[in-house]
């Protein structure tokens, strides 16, 4: 039976969040609502989730000794990774010593890079995926491209938000795609995955929650990407019953293999009734921001319940809903947002401004949310709200 104490007291139930972006911020808010004491950790100060946590620490999260020192000092009941770039070997060791990692340290380790999770899905679980090769050198990469043919996709095995990702259409793209992948990898230069291109009709995120009562699926989330980075998402994505059933089978297989409890974002390619596994995040997913307006329990509320061992008896979906990101380009440490009244002038709209302390280049700084009578209308409304926001750098 779940028992939650009083924050900042000897009975407190403590959660330590590793990574403090906008997704972590919403998770912290949901945990706070349930009376949990939250400690936020990231590599930079004043990150979004730090602004709503009880306290925070700034460390290099790829430094295992620094991560261990914070965890041993704070003694959290639950360690919750919010990003991939963490010293996962340290999480594995801490889990073996009795700490609880959400969903599991193995899940964090396998999903830290694309190779671990792709080999699990394709080679161990025999799930349908695109054809693929891994390469460490330009020579091996060139051979893989030749073998798979054009078009194909190259990505660093360790990167997020589309960084370093390219679609190769001809031999002219081979060198520049390699160079871009080497620049975009999270741990610096290195290994890449080359994938055969699937001519899919659409892609979805199937938000899958493993909780005390079993496994529950949210309605499928459709999304549009640019350069591998999410621009808008909507729910529910229309699918054939056959494709939806197969999507749930694939999502259940991969989340069961990763184990533990929590919310997972399972990315899938769909063509007609066919489904291919793409990737999985063992945590809330950026495309799932739409659930802040589309469901009675957002993906963040679901994650909080699952972490704490609370049941999810039912998820109510409110009908056609959409999200559109507020993307800011430039440089500033004091970004301001204006014209918000116009952005919120239509019924069934909402905004989330993430409170990121700086922008240097291009950065997602907020999201507009909307509901309407159809997906098309909801998408258009969310986009209008997003575009109405005036950004002052």
Curated annotation (Swiss-Prot):
Query: For this protein, what is any one GO molecular function term?
Result: magnesium ion binding
**Pathway where this protein functions:** Purine metabolism; IMP biosynthesis via de novo pathway; N(2)-formyl-N(1)-(5-phospho-D-ribosyl)glycinamide from N(1)-(5-phospho-D-ribosyl)glycinamide (formate route): step 1/1
Binding of N(1)-(5-phospho-beta-D-ribosyl)glycinamide, residues: 22-23, 82, 286, 356, 363-364
EC number, UniProt record = 6.3.1.21
Residues binding ATP are 114, 155, 160-165, 195-198, 203
Q: Please cite one Gene Ontology biological process associated with this protein.
A: 'de novo' IMP biosynthetic process
Q: Which residues form the ATP-grasp domain?
A: 119-308
Catalytic activity annotation: N(1)-(5-phospho-beta-D-ribosyl)glycinamide + formate + ATP = N(2)-formyl-N(1)-(5-phospho-beta-D-ribosyl)glycinamide + ADP + phosphate + H(+)
Looking up Pfam families in the UniProt record yields: ATP-grasp, PurT_C, RS_preATP-grasp-like
- Disulfide bond annotation, renumbered to this chain: none
* Assigned keywords, A-Z: ATP-binding, Ligase, Magnesium, Metal-binding, Nucleotide-binding, Purine biosynthesis
* Superkingdom classification of source: Bacteria
Tell me which residues bind Mg(2+): 267, 279
Q: Which GO terms describe its cellular component?
A: cytosol
Q: How does it assemble?
A: Homodimer.
Function field: Involved in the de novo purine biosynthesis. Catalyzes the transfer of formate to 5-phospho-ribosyl-glycinamide (GAR), producing 5-phospho-ribosyl-N-formylglycinamide (FGAR). Formate is provided by PurU via hydrolysis of 10-formyl-tetrahydrofolate.
| Assigned protein family | Belongs to the PurK/PurT family.
Give the protein's recorded name: Formate-dependent phosphoribosylglycinamide formyltransferase
Q: Which organism is it from?
A: Pseudomonas fluorescens (strain Pf0-1)
């Amino acid at each position: 039976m779940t028992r939650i104490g009083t924050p900042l007291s000897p009975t407190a139930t403590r959660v330590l969040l590793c990574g403090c972006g906008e997704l972590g911020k919403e998770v912290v808010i949901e945990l706070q609502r349930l009376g949990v004491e939250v400690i936020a950790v990231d590599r930079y100060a004043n990150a979004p989730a730090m602004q709503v946590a009880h306290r925070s620490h700034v460390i290099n999260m790829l430094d295992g000794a620094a991560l261990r020192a914070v965890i041993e000092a704070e003694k959290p009941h639950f360690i919750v990774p919010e990003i991939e770039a963490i010293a996962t070997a340290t999480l594995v060791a801490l889990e073996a010593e009795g700490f609880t990692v959400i969903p599991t340290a193995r899940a964090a380790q396998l999903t830290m890079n694309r190779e671990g999770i792709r080999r699990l899905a394709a080679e161990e679980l025999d799930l349908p995926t695109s054809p693929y090769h891994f390469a460490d050198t330009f020579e091996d990469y060139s051979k893989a491209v030749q073998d798979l043919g054009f078009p194909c996709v190259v990505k660093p095995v360790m990167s997020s938000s589309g960084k370093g990702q390219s679609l190769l259409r001809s031999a002219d793209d081979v060198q520049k795609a390699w160079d871009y992948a080497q620049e975009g990898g999270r741990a610096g230069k290195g290994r890449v995955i080359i994938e055969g291109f699937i001519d899919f009709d659409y892609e979805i995120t199937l938000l899958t929650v493993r909780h005390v009562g079993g496994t529950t699926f949210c309605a499928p989330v459709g999304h549009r990407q640019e350069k591998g980075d999410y621009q808008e998402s909507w729910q529910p994505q229309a699918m054939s019953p056959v494709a939806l059933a197969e999507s749930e089978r694939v999502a259940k297989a991969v989340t069961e293999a990763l184990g533990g409890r929590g919310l997972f974002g399972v990315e899938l390619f769909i063509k007609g009734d066919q489904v291919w596994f793409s990737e999985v995040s063992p945590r809330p997913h950026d495309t799932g921001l739409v659930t802040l307006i589309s469901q009675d329990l957002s993906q963040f509320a679901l994650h909080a319940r699952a972490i704490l061992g609370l049941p999810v008896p039912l998820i109510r979906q409110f009908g056609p809903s959409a999200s559109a990101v507020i993307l800011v380009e430039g440089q500033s440490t004091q970004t301001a947002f204006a014209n918000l009244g116009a952005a919120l002038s239509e019924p069934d709209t909402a905004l989330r401004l993430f409170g990121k302390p700086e922008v240097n280049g291009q950065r997602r700084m907020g999201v507009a949310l909307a509901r309407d009578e159809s997906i098309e209308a909801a998408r258009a409304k969310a986009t209008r709200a997003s575009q109405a926001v005036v950004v002052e750098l």
